[in-house]
Protein backbone atom coordinates (compact mmCIF):
# COMPACT_ATOMS: atom_id res chain seq x y z
CA UNK A 1 0.00 0.00 0.00
CA UNK A 2 1.17 3.51 -0.83
CA UNK A 3 0.04 6.62 0.98
CA UNK A 4 0.99 10.27 0.90
CA UNK A 5 0.02 13.73 -0.20
CA UNK A 6 -0.20 15.08 -3.73
CA UNK A 7 -0.85 18.36 -5.47
CA UNK A 8 -2.98 18.94 -8.57
CA UNK A 9 -2.36 22.24 -10.29
CA UNK A 10 -4.70 23.57 -12.95
CA UNK A 11 -3.68 26.96 -14.22
CA UNK A 12 -6.04 29.42 -15.85
CA UNK A 13 -5.13 32.47 -17.92
CA UNK A 14 -1.33 32.35 -18.08
CA UNK A 15 -1.58 34.87 -20.90
CA UNK A 16 -3.44 37.40 -18.74
CA UNK A 17 -0.31 39.32 -17.73
CA UNK A 18 -0.12 43.03 -18.50
CA UNK A 19 2.63 44.18 -20.90
CA UNK A 20 4.81 45.48 -18.03
CA UNK A 21 4.57 42.17 -16.11
CA UNK A 22 7.32 39.56 -16.51
CA UNK A 23 6.11 36.65 -14.36
CA UNK A 24 4.83 35.58 -10.98
CA UNK A 25 5.81 33.89 -7.74
CA UNK A 26 3.05 31.67 -6.29
CA UNK A 27 3.13 30.05 -2.84
CA UNK A 28 0.78 27.26 -1.68
CA UNK A 29 1.65 26.50 1.96
CA UNK A 30 0.11 24.08 4.47
CA UNK A 31 0.98 24.15 8.16
CA UNK A 32 0.93 21.35 10.72
CA UNK A 33 -1.48 23.34 12.92
CA UNK A 34 -4.21 23.04 10.24
CA UNK A 35 -3.82 26.50 8.72
CA UNK A 36 -2.91 27.23 5.10
CA UNK A 37 -1.65 30.17 3.07
CA UNK A 38 -1.75 31.00 -0.62
CA UNK A 39 0.14 34.05 -1.86
CA UNK A 40 1.11 35.27 -5.28
CA UNK A 41 2.99 38.27 -6.50
CA UNK A 42 3.09 39.42 -10.10
CA UNK A 43 6.52 40.84 -10.86
CA UNK A 44 7.17 43.76 -13.19
CA UNK A 45 10.23 44.44 -15.33
CA UNK A 46 11.43 47.17 -12.93
CA UNK A 47 11.50 44.71 -10.00
CA UNK A 48 8.31 45.92 -8.34
CA UNK A 49 5.19 43.82 -7.79
CA UNK A 50 1.71 44.80 -8.94
CA UNK A 51 -1.16 45.79 -6.70
CA UNK A 52 -3.01 42.77 -8.12
CA UNK A 53 -0.75 40.48 -6.10
CA UNK A 54 -2.84 38.90 -3.36
CA UNK A 55 -3.44 35.87 -1.19
CA UNK A 56 -5.68 33.94 1.16
CA UNK A 57 -5.07 32.67 4.68
CA UNK A 58 -7.22 29.78 5.89
CA UNK A 59 -7.46 29.49 9.67
CA UNK A 60 -7.64 26.17 11.48
CA UNK A 61 -11.41 26.57 11.91
CA UNK A 62 -11.87 27.07 8.15
CA UNK A 63 -12.27 30.83 8.32
CA UNK A 64 -10.85 32.60 5.28
CA UNK A 65 -8.94 35.89 5.36
CA UNK A 66 -8.36 37.55 1.96
CA UNK A 67 -5.02 39.34 1.67
CA UNK A 68 -4.14 42.30 -0.53
CA UNK A 69 -0.66 43.08 -1.80
CA UNK A 70 -0.25 45.69 0.95
CA UNK A 71 -0.87 43.03 3.63
CA UNK A 72 2.24 40.95 3.02
CA UNK A 73 5.96 41.21 2.39
CA UNK A 74 8.05 38.52 0.68
CA UNK A 75 11.82 38.97 0.96
CA UNK A 76 14.28 36.73 -0.90
CA UNK A 77 17.08 35.50 1.37
CA UNK A 78 18.91 33.09 -0.96
CA UNK A 79 19.14 32.40 -4.70
CA UNK A 80 20.22 29.58 -7.02
CA UNK A 81 21.42 29.85 -10.63
CA UNK A 82 20.58 27.08 -13.10
CA UNK A 83 23.47 25.66 -15.12
CA UNK A 84 20.92 24.71 -17.81
CA UNK A 85 18.93 27.92 -18.37
CA UNK A 86 21.17 30.51 -16.71
CA UNK A 87 18.18 31.80 -14.71
CA UNK A 88 18.66 32.86 -11.11
CA UNK A 89 15.73 31.93 -8.86
CA UNK A 90 14.88 32.78 -5.26
CA UNK A 91 15.12 29.59 -3.15
CA UNK A 92 14.63 30.97 0.37
CA UNK A 93 12.27 33.63 1.68
CA UNK A 94 11.04 35.56 4.66
CA UNK A 95 7.30 36.17 4.59
CA UNK A 96 5.62 38.62 6.93
CA UNK A 97 1.89 39.26 7.28
CA UNK A 98 1.62 41.63 10.21
CA UNK A 99 -2.17 41.88 9.89
CA UNK A 100 -2.61 38.26 11.03
CA UNK A 101 0.54 37.95 13.16
CA UNK A 102 2.41 35.58 10.82
CA UNK A 103 6.17 35.56 10.18
CA UNK A 104 7.84 32.75 8.24
CA UNK A 105 11.22 31.61 7.01
CA UNK A 106 11.10 29.12 4.18
CA UNK A 107 13.50 27.37 1.85
CA UNK A 108 13.42 24.97 -1.07
CA UNK A 109 13.92 21.33 -0.09
CA UNK A 110 16.47 21.24 -2.92
CA UNK A 111 17.66 24.09 -5.11
CA UNK A 112 17.34 22.51 -8.56
CA UNK A 113 13.60 22.17 -9.12
CA UNK A 114 13.62 23.89 -12.50
CA UNK A 115 11.28 22.55 -15.20
CA UNK A 116 12.47 23.13 -18.73
CA UNK A 117 9.41 22.64 -20.91
CA UNK A 118 7.93 24.94 -23.58
CA UNK A 119 8.33 27.57 -20.85
CA UNK A 120 10.98 27.28 -18.15
CA UNK A 121 9.58 27.41 -14.62
CA UNK A 122 10.87 26.71 -11.15
CA UNK A 123 8.30 24.59 -9.34
CA UNK A 124 9.16 22.85 -6.14
CA UNK A 125 8.68 21.75 -2.56
CA UNK A 126 9.56 24.03 0.34
CA UNK A 127 9.70 23.77 4.14
CA UNK A 128 8.75 26.65 6.44
CA UNK A 129 8.89 27.64 10.08
CA UNK A 130 8.06 30.75 12.01
CA UNK A 131 5.47 32.21 14.34
CA UNK A 132 1.71 32.64 14.09
CA UNK A 133 0.09 34.86 16.72
CA UNK A 134 3.07 34.31 19.02
CA UNK A 135 3.15 30.50 18.69
CA UNK A 136 5.64 28.39 16.72
CA UNK A 137 4.40 27.23 13.31
CA UNK A 138 5.91 24.96 10.67
CA UNK A 139 4.81 23.26 7.50
CA UNK A 140 5.48 22.35 3.91
CA UNK A 141 4.41 23.84 0.64
CA UNK A 142 4.86 24.30 -3.05
CA UNK A 143 6.22 27.32 -4.92
CA UNK A 144 5.89 28.15 -8.61
CA UNK A 145 8.01 30.91 -10.17
CA UNK A 146 7.79 32.04 -13.77
CA UNK A 147 9.42 34.69 -15.92
CA UNK A 148 12.97 34.31 -14.65
CA UNK A 149 14.26 32.99 -18.00
CA UNK A 150 11.94 34.79 -20.39
CA UNK A 151 8.94 37.05 -19.94
CA UNK A 152 5.66 35.19 -20.05
CA UNK A 153 3.48 36.51 -22.83
Regions found by a protein language model. Name each.
Residues 1-153:
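Structured soluble/peripheral alpha/beta segments that form catalytic or ligand/cofactor-binding pockets
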